């Protein structure tokens, strides 16, 4: 589960809910649950894939592989309720209808639907995953569609220097903290490669592609966001990369998207872009706004 690195099939659920350890006992309980006859040749416990280490990249890869395409799921509804549309990010975003959540080591496991995003390194290898547990009851202005639990967002795997990536960066990249923040910017700049580092500390430590020439930093409008932008700017410039910081009017760019609308956001970003990047990355309608 989310705490052990084992994610989501029937055997996992039976083992967790019944407190079983031995594979034969779990298999027997599964047969009883499904009204299946006992097979003549029992499967060997050694044939089962061993559980991945808690929080490891392998656990993250398994979780992402077990998730399903996002379109026409609660994850798509969640993003649309956050103002994020159209969606072009089918590769990085997936959905798990029954993703395990455990508040702490001493609490029982809960099951909630979740948006699953992959974290990758500069070569595109999956190094981690991020989970946003969702509320199947719908959207509200307090939780914004996230599940009513203590920590509805959690990441796992090797995160430092890596990111949730939208598009493949070569010479130009936009980077920020949150997934929804960067997806909000993709509504205006649908072909600009972007990276969500998942936190201010990780944004400051983001590894930059060796071919990068210009970096747009989409900071959050708080002290942590300011510190991350300063640190990343210094690192970029020391590597010979031009760094330009974008600051939202509100707390982050998703708040801007929902509060001022896509047209006003596009007009604000247009004047922050290098002229050739307007023609290269901004949607024609957005580029003509204002």
Predicted regions span which residues?
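Short, solvent-exposed polar/charged micro-motifs at secondary-structure junctions
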Residues: 38, 98-106, 139-140, 254-258
């Amino acid at each position: 589960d989310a705490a052990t690195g084992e994610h989501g099939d029937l055997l996992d659920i039976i083992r967790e809910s019944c407190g079983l350890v031995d594979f034969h006992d779990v298999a027997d309980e599964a047969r009883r649950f499904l009204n299946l006859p006992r097979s003549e040749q029992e499967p060997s416990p050694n044939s089962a894939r061993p559980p991945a280490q808690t929080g490891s990249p392998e656990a993250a890869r398994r979780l992402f592989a077990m998730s399903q395409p996002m379109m026409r799921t609660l994850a798509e509804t969640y993003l649309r309720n956050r103002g994020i549309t159209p969606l072009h990010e089918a590769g990085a975003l997936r959905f798990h209808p029954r993703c395990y959540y455990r508040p702490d080591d001493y609490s029982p496991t809960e099951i909630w639907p979740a948006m699953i995003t992959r974290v990758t390194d500069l070569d595109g290898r999956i190094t981690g995953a991020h989970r946003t547990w969702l509320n199947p009851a719908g959207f509200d202005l307090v939780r914004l569609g996230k599940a009513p639990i203590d920590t509805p967002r959690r990441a796992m795997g090797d995160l430092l220097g890596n990111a949730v990536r939208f598009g493949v960066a070569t010479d130009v990249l936009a980077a920020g903290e949150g997934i929804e923040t960067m997806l909000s910017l993709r509504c205006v700049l649908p072909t600009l490669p972007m990276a969500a580092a998942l936190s201010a500390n990780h944004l400051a430590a983001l590894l930059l592609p060796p071919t990068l020439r210009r970096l747009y930093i989409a900071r959050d409008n708080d002290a942590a966001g300011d510190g991350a932008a300063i640190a990343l700017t210094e690192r970029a410039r020391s590597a010979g990369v031009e760094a330009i910081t974008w600051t939202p009017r509100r707390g982050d760019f998703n708040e801007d998207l929902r509060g001022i609308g896509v047209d006003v956001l596009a007009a604000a970003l247009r004047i922050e872009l290098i002229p050739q990047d307007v023609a290269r990355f901004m949607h024609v309608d957005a580029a003509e706004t204002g």
